Amino acid sequence: MNEQELKQMIEGILTEMSGGKTTDTVAAAPTKSVVETVVTEGSIPDITEVDIKKQLLVPEPADREGYLKMKQMTPARLGLWRAGPRYKTETILRFRADHAVAQDSVFSYVSEDLVKEMNFIPVNTKCHDKDEYLTRPDLGREFDDEMVEVIRANTTKNAKLQIVVGDGLSSAAIEANIKDILPSIKQGLKMYNLDFDNIIFVKHCRVPSMDQIGEITGADVVCLLVGERPGLVTAESMSAYIAYKPTVGMPEARRTVISNIHSGGTPPVEAGAYIAELIHNMLEKKCSGIDLK
């Protein structure tokens, strides 16, 4: 029995079972269940944009105005609430978001476009990547022979002042503050008939790298603007380390430091004016750090 005969036999059996009526079997089309999907153009709000100083999560506080007044004095996480022994979901999410911002700032780099826009002289320490930078701080203080020649060729020998910008532990700090603080420093220096020319930008920068730059350039004063280690309050805080005739291996006490430079701390414009005054005092007294007091 071939396939055609088998097919005819099956059709005959089906005809007998249906009472002799021949029916054309048509596969039933699947029914469509219509599900309307609503697509919105909205976006999830950025939880990090909420001003912690104005946020009070305590329900029905006894002195709401007093609580908010206290919060205006500090970015600390006051006025939180809980569910049993645990923080509320919003508080946990904000904590994790701020921590993520801090991590991103450490592992990201200052934009190359910004370095070009500001006409910085780019150099790199002996660190090859972020992992080596974080695990080998000693390499972040030194330059190889090639970088030494780049610094020597692009700076004025024995200048009164050499400005250095370093990414440090926060690229966000440099990108947020450098455009405001440099003009402020330059303007402040004009009051003392001082100026600076080419600015060195150090990638994978540790603070003592300014010491080797001081020895290479022979500058009287070296001022390093560097990103601070970010915290949960801000990732945009920058510091200025200033030293008179820095040398490799010198004591940390010879550095003068201005920290917490950002919009929520010491504004960069205000810090720039103070830095200019400090530089003038160092040149006048020929010292820095604790010796300047």
UniProtKB/Swiss-Prot annotation:
Coiled coil regions in record: none
Protein name per UniProt: Ethanolamine ammonia-lyase small subunit
Entry-linked Pfam families: EutC
Record function comment: Catalyzes the deamination of various vicinal amino-alcohols to oxo compounds. Allows this organism to utilize ethanolamine as the sole source of nitrogen and carbon in the presence of external vitamin B12.
PANTHER family reported for this sequence: ETHANOLAMINE AMMONIA-LYASE LIGHT CHAIN, ETHANOLAMINE AMMONIA-LYASE SMALL SUBUNIT
Family label: Belongs to the EutC family.
Cofactor requirement: adenosylcob(III)alamin
Catalytic activity: ethanolamine = acetaldehyde + NH4(+)
InterPro entries on file: EutC, EutC_C, EutC_N
Quaternary structure note: The basic unit is a heterodimer which dimerizes to form tetramers. The heterotetramers trimerize; 6 large subunits form a core ring with 6 small subunits projecting outwards.
List of residues binding adenosylcob(III)alamin: V207, E228
Keyword Lyase: yes
Keyword entries, A-Z: Bacterial microcompartment, Cobalamin, Cobalt, Lyase
EC number: 4.3.1.7
Pathway: Amine and polyamine degradation; ethanolamine degradation
Compartments (UniProt record): Bacterial microcompartment
Superkingdom in the source lineage: Bacteria
EC top class, as a word: lyase
One annotated GO molecular function: ethanolamine ammonia-lyase activity
Gene Ontology CC annotation, any one: ethanolamine degradation polyhedral organelle
GO biological process: one example: ethanolamine catabolic process
